[in-house]
Amino acid sequence: MAVRQALGRGLQLGRALLLRFTGKPGRAYGLGRPGPAAGCVRGERPGWAAGPGAEPRRVGLGLPNRLRFFRQSVAGLAARLQRQFVVRAWGCAGPCGRAVFLAFGLGLGLIEEKQAESRRAVSACQEIQAIFTQKSKPGPDPLDTRRLQGFRLEEYLIGQSIGKGCSAAVYEATMPTLPQNLEVTKSTGLLPGRGPGTSAPGEGQERAPGAPAFPLAIKMMWNISAGSSSEAILNTMSQELVPASRVALAGEYGAVTYRKSKRGPKQLAPHPNIIRVLRAFTSSVPLLPGALVDYPDVLPSRLHPEGLGHGRTLFLVMKNYPCTLRQYLCVNTPSPRLAAMMLLQLLEGVDHLVQQGIAHRDLKSDNILVELDPDGCPWLVIADFGCCLADESIGLQLPFSSWYVDRGGNGCLMAPEVSTARPGPRAVIDYSKADAWAVGAIAYEIFGLVNPFYGQGKAHLESRSYQEAQLPALPESVPPDVRQLVRALLQREASKRPSARVAANVLHLSLWGEHILALKNLKLDKMVGWLLQQSAATLLANRLTEKCCVETKMKMLFLANLECETLCQAALLLCSWRAAL
């Protein structure tokens, strides 16, 4: 009983306080009838009905109803206070107060309009991206129709050497499917698993006119320290398997299933500007053409008495590309526009790596392959992932606890934040913009100059010590936007450097969005209209031609990776550069 009286007394005091704040003590809030507190104001005793002869009544209602009544009273009070504030601000505060209130309302309206415009732009970009994501997939796999084949070295016809690096040799190859092809290749001295240099004595070494072409390339890794077991080889050389396709390691007939460890490398999603490993398997090391001359020391002792290599190694099967970027630039001088498109392709590939949490760490013109479209325009593909950082557990943040931690393969094109890093208990190297810096250095080669980070002499720069003012100027024929972008990519501080995605968007806008950038007031709705026009034109161009040209492919990649935020960043960056000229 005492508890109930205490609660009732507290409720009465609360109501009295609320009534005093409103200035109308005779009414309860939202109910339209006098409350108990009204009697207190008139001097009446709470708990008794007004008037003579009235019977006494209990104070308040039951506890749940009392709380409901209190909640309704507070809600009514809040609504009336809000109405009073609006009335006073509009009618009682004078002209100055009205102006402030009007400006505040207009500001809120403008903010809401901007937010609605931004939401519409983001939604449009997402819809465009969804359409082109399905249309920007890589081309068909040459071995798609032979999913159960290609996992043994004996199934391939190996031709001449394509090239060699510091850890592998690459040979041209093909895989016959019909018996008549085998008969033709036997007559030319090409035997399964053997090259022309290993054919039997007395067999012809020249190819007949009907000899098959070599659409594939086989990369034979040099195994010096991995041992001879297949599982040890796959684990030691696992970085080479990062760009492997889903079926590359799923073979039968002697192929070893790769057991991916918890700290193993990531599997890279396919991208048109990144190499695909079609098959990967281990096999005995054969004596291939030029082996005794080009790399005798890494051969097993059964092939060369002084060889240090093991008897088995890893073989990777890929598409055969005509040349590397370095070889292409030795005999070709691309126009400034074509060179900008080549630079754009590298940035698209690097952006895909960053989105996947992978750093290549060995980008150079020798590790970039080139093929030509029907119009002779080069299509670039990033290859050789032997030095990549693709750890599931750390992503692009490499703990640098000691000098024994591997920072990558190419010291000349190592970004400043990597080359100047010093080990420590909490030291971390951020590779999120390191490959983009390397692309900026390769841009000099693409535009016809010597890479300033190669060679010797006064013109040679080192990534650990150079200053931006020392960077050589690109030719005047290069568009100003591209020159500014290359200098931005080579900023020493990674925080001042644009990401690969923003840099790619800068080139897209510079190449195909000139009339949008020419507008004095660049608005989102204008940008969305331009994107819709580009989408329609790109879809039409893609349907009218059997094989897309490089320009159409690049537009499709741009629209497949479309993000409103990064596109606006690129547009603002371009506008700031042009305003500074």
From Swiss-Prot:
Annotated spans, Disordered: 189-208
Source domain of life: Eukaryota
Magnesium in keyword set: yes
Record membrane topology: Single-pass membrane protein
Effect of residue 125 to G: In PARK6; under depolarizing conditions, it fails to support PINK1-TOM-TIM23 complex assembly and mitophagy activation; no effect on interaction with TIMM23
Mutagenesis / variant outcome for changing residue 476 to K: May predispose to Parkinson disease development; affects cellular response to stress resulting in increased mitochondrial depolarization under stress conditions compared to wild type
Modified sites of kind Phosphoserine: 228, 402
Identification of the protein by name: Serine/threonine-protein kinase PINK1, mitochondrial
UniProt source species: Homo sapiens (Human)
Gene: PINK1
